[in-house]
């Protein structure tokens, strides 16, 4: 039988752990990920083993069994690449070049197929770029988000990967879980983390770890402030303080995100 990752939402995490909503529990959720089986394991070592077994079962057993995978190591390495570049903009050609720089001959088509297999197995999700001004999807660069944060935290923790990236990934998963179609947005020369659509509703969201400095606020609010339409605009962060609205751009603390969706 195929294995499917059942990723817990933050709300489910709180229920399972019997914790109140807030910064501390949200941080713990980001660090643990959403695999419920992880919550009862006694040691970090056993957690690592569990996450590795989930990854191997899906990648090496399910995908390899169903798909024409000639190079199993490449499949594994592409997944590692996605884990370490989740929430970064890149193209398939970028990854081809990355492997070429490591003296590995990889064809564009093989790479594209393997990425597709990883997506079909729900290990990672591809997010297309959406041009907000032109209201259309832009080909080329896209972003990938992981189905579960535990891959990053337990399997490849050595890479410099800030809480901000984990937060962005968690916000993506929450939007998706609640039935939104999610794009990464671009408006003129600015990037918007998420354009989320559901029925007639369109929401623009920026996810950032902390808004503590004026510079950060400026950087995170600027793209949203330049969009001239009347759709909802939010900055999601992990600040203890709830900031006031800024010209229609509202601030929401990550642990309260579900309330507005």
Locate predicted features.
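Amphipathic alpha-helical "lid/sensor" segments that cap RecA-like P-loop NTPase cores
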Residues: 17-57, 68
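Short, small-residue-biased leader/transition segments that mark boundaries at the very start
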Residues: 3-5
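Nucleic-acid nuclease catalytic cores
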Residues: 187, 228-247
